[in-house]
Amino acid sequence: MDYINLNYRPNEGDLLSCMVIKGENLEKLANEIAGESSIGTWTKVQTMKSDIYEKLRPKVYEIKEIGEENGYKVGLIKIAYPLYDFEINNMPGVLAGIAGNIFGMKIAKGLRILDFRFPAEFVKAYKGPRFGIEGVRETLKIKERPLLGTIVKPKVGLKTEEHAKVAYEAWVGGVDLVKDDENLTSQEFNKFEDRIYKTLEMRDKAEEETGERKAYMPNITAPYREMIRRAEIAEDAGSEYVMIDVVVCGFSAVQSFREEDFKFIIHAHRAMHAAMTRSRDFGISMLALAKIYRLLGVDQLHIGTVVGKMEGGEKEVKAIRDEIVYDKVEADNENKFFNQDWFDIKPVFPVSSGGVHPRLVPKIVEILGRDLIIQAGGGVHGHPDGTRAGAKAMRAAIEAIIEGKSLEEKAEEVAELKKALEYWK
């Protein structure tokens, strides 16, 4: 069957996919990708009807050769899928088609999905974030400045009382948000039930002492029924937040959790994303994943730092930021390959985390703006004078930006920042 139609112009109702492919024959590969991701299989079948072919057939409407690698041609292709192909409010089902078997095809020597364009009917079938940026700011009573977050360190090993004490020290030092690390769940030395009540007790104490709103983001990642049980505990304990490791939990769990009756702000940690996003040969871009998570309804999402320890260049990270923050996004044909209208879907609060310390704060804000959660683990707890001093230094670095001061000027007012700048050259 032929799925290539280079004269086709996508209509507003099509779901579009853009990918880089590698193979001996780009046209043949593109044709097989389109078929495998929709109605095709490896041979002609007698059960195929003409009306199925006409109604459900996707169209490869662009094939552009962009290079050669190891004797194979490399090309950029775009495919338009009719929405009739999909159960549109079933993200796992949709992805089983457009991002499923195609990665295992022998003919493909490379296949990386770069972007999707979700049409209006598709977008409106999803809830999106419950709170979004404005809702988070309203909850924490922080109008304009970047939010400051930290992660309790070490990742695992602290006992419940120790964990809560570290969180308290961070809060009173100036941190707004404290979260569990991605691999802290309910280990023997720090059970979830005990940890959440004790840590929220310390949150209340920190709020009383500082006069500021503070929040704890407990990691409820677990098999789904247990995840719901932990969410119920978090609700009973008075937490405004939960954190979910969205990649390892799966698209189904994230979509289902958002459709529950909970009123949590959902913080999405992307642990394991690089297994899909980092390879330039096979996988899915972080931008494409971020668009999916915006639809599914997370309120906060890690996107990278550009200047920290995690992989991701400036243009790529800014493109991800654009897709989760803005109502309408225009293609740049470098990282964003489609215009995207998000209609009434709220924006996601971007999180910059990974190797962050006070000296990096001005550059991060310069690149990504003030609608940002700056999250520092080692950059808080690694301060020579401890967690509280590290929190004060990070908060002072943010305040320097708001006040129009250099870090060095602010350091003359805040000793903890001065020591941090001396420590992290």
Curated annotation (Swiss-Prot):
Which Enzyme Commission numbers does its entry carry?
A: 4.1.1.39
Activity over temperature: Optimum temperature is 65 degrees Celsius. Highly thermostable.
What's its catalytic activity? 2 (2R)-3-phosphoglycerate + 2 H(+) = D-ribulose 1,5-bisphosphate + CO2 + H2O; D-ribulose 1,5-bisphosphate + O2 = 2-phosphoglycolate + (2R)-3-phosphoglycerate + 2 H(+)
Instruction: Specify which residues bind substrate according to the UniProt entry for this protein.
Output: K155, R270, H302, S353, G354, G355, Q375, A376, G377, G378
Q: How is its activity regulated?
A: Reversibly inhibited by O(2).
**CC cofactor note:** Binds 1 Mg(2+) ion per subunit.
Amino acids binding Mg(2+): K179, D181, E182
Marked site, Transition state stabilizer, at: K309
Example GO biological process term?
A: carbon fixation
Pfam families xref list:
RuBisCO_large (PF00016), RuBisCO_large_N (PF02788)
Organism superkingdom:
Archaea
Any single GO molecular-function term of the entry would be: oxidoreductase activity
Name the cofactor(s) required for activity, per the record.
Answer: Mg(2+)
Subunit and partners: Homodimer. In contrast to form I RuBisCO, the form III RuBisCO is composed solely of large subunits.
Q: What does this protein do?
A: Catalyzes the addition of molecular CO(2) and H(2)O to ribulose 1,5-bisphosphate (RuBP), generating two molecules of 3-phosphoglycerate (3-PGA). Functions in an archaeal AMP degradation pathway, together with AMP phosphorylase and R15P isomerase.
The record's comment on protein family reads: Belongs to the RuBisCO large chain family. Type III subfamily.
Q: What else is known?
A: Because the Archaea possessing a type III RuBisCO are all anaerobic, it is most likely that only the carboxylase activity of RuBisCO, and not the competitive oxygenase activity (by which RuBP reacts with O(2) to form one molecule of 3-phosphoglycerate and one molecule of 2-phosphoglycolate), is biologically relevant in these strains.
> Under which name does UniProt file this protein?
Ribulose bisphosphate carboxylase
